[in-house]
Amino acid sequence: MAFSVSPSVIVREVDASASVPAIATPPAAIAGVFRWGPVGEAILLSSENELVNRYGSPDDTNYETFFTAADYLSYSNALYVARVDNGATHADTYTRVTANNVTTTTDTSGAFKGLYPGELGNSLEVAYVRSEAYEGVIVEMGEDGTSNIPTNKITGNTDLTHTIAFNSANVSFEVSKANKLPIADIDIDDVFVIGNNSVGYQNIPVASIAEVARNAGGTVETDDALIAAYSYDITFNGKYTLPETSLNKLKIDRKWAWSGLFAKKPQDGNYHIAVIDQDGSVSGTADSVLELYTDVSTTTSAKLSSGKTNYYKDIITQESAWVQVANTAHFEANTSTSSYESLAGATAGRTESDATLADLAGGYDLFKSANEIDVSFVLQGKGDSAGNLATYIISNVADYRKDCIAFISPASSDVVDESKTEKMLSNVIDYRNSLPSSSYSVIDSGYKYRYDRYNDVYRYTPLNGDVAGLASRVEPYESPAGFRKGVIKNVVKLAFNPNKAQRDQLYSNEVNPVMSQVGQGIVLFGDKTGLGQNSAFDRINVRRLFIAVEKSIANAAQSFLFELNDEFTQAQFKGIVEPFLRDIQGRRGIVDFRVISDATVNTPAVIDQGKFRANIFIKPARSINNIELTFVATRSGVEFEEIVGSLT
């Protein structure tokens, strides 16, 4: 407190409102192989749709990892996902087919590359056009009045012959020196709009442009420059299907293939950009539009009226989920033609079955520090038969942090690939025995059979995402198992459905059985941790209760750092902890408790060392694992009071 010599009013404020924060369930975490998304970065997701949008839909290379994450998100709404580095590469080369002096070429140095590594990048096309190349009239024919256009072909004046064979995909242009068509302005995938007001108009995309070494008179052209610039055939992706009738006028316009997605052409010098899913691997539908960027500028200082940048590179860097700018000079050089760059060169890398322990460990290490990311559960996803990944997660993440639980499933080869339940049982027990004993782990009995709507197939996927999801739906001091709270979602059947004798064996080895029962569904039928000894911490609810209580009280205790260790501080600490524990007791999570933080533990020696000590004793509530029902038949004349209490 400040002192004053002369008369004055000193204001002092004391905060006596400190309390222990309420118990909350932090997000879960998983690392694994995904088809798309950032590598080596933990992203918080809240739904399966976000999972698909950020990391792509599953395929045969990663469905176990994907559905572990998706299944957890069907119970909860907070999951950190980390994509591991499995050796996948970016789509950083391009197939850009252009009509440059009527030669079809391939350009492997394009303006864009895939934003993330992975084969999905090969499905992307980036189409862009500057205002000058957005649209234009190719030719108008039949206007000179010399003759009508016959039904089998369309012919212009003597300097230009443009032939369309009805119901054919081939169109032939023949051009002499006197009438030069701007071939340099035409690009593969541009759209020709052919027709007139009488018969209507038809859009036909350009498929290829090839050189024709002749002029309008039918003689061979010897001037290479003229051949290259003005003599060509065009083939379309589609047939000319307008009415087969004589026409006295026909107009052909060229336009950018994706012009229909924009209200108008870009302002002078600006560009429209479209990111397209060419083969449907991203969206499920070929040629789906993923992203549009309207009227963007190549000027680095360009701004919109709102003050937001209009520089194309900055916009794509900030907003695109699919591409990044790789070569600004290449992009800005395309001023007079439209461009369609098909991304290529990406590789998928190692699958979830081939991923090394080093690959996966690198992802799970992102969750190793309790000070950086707060998580409650760590999901294993796909397991390996040797238990190496599970051991790493238990030992180096869960046991290391001591504030989260690892959820583990056996390998698919232990149950899915076996036909006899006796062998499945021994495999699962052997798998569990290969893992370390820890109260920070929970082990289930296997795999479930579920529907994969993304590929229209049924697949076996691990149950650790479901078991963790069940735990996320109950209070930390409650068991997630049983017919009320332990019903598994999104399941057709189990790979291993243990009977009573097999469940006894599994439970004796700290494996929580998941079983199917007629009329009840498929349920989690155990709530043990992976601790291989008799202890209060061999139950999920007790371990979770202590994690929650320890984290909450530890967070509250931070405010006492650098305070004076006297009776007032000791009583104040007890005063904020006891109401917190009393609230949990009132909700049936604790049977009894006691907090000791007085001079009996804060001795002068402890105080002189700059320490503060508090002992917190807790009697946790226990879940029911066995129910014994005794039915007693008595004689008619016997009073119940005579025998009640005599039975044990």
Model-derived features with residue positions:
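Structured, hydrophobic secondary-structure cores that serve as assembly/anchoring elements
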Residues: 1-97, 110-115, 193-196, 277, ...
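Autoprocessing Asn-cyclization modules and mimics
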Residues: 97-113, 119, 127-241
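Intrinsically disordered, low-complexity regulatory segments in eukaryotic proteins
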Residues: 99-105, 126, 253-264, 364-368
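Residues at beta-strand starts and edge strands
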Residues: 106-108, 122, 228-232, 267-269, ...
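Short, cationic low-complexity segments
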Residues: 134-137, 255, 259-261, 298-302, ...
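Surface-exposed interaction regions enriched in Ser/Thr/Asp/Glu
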Residues: 236-260, 266-274
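Acidic, small/polar residue-enriched beta-strand/turn segments
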Residues: 237-252, 279-299
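E2/UBC-UEV (E2-variant) core
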Residues: 287-322
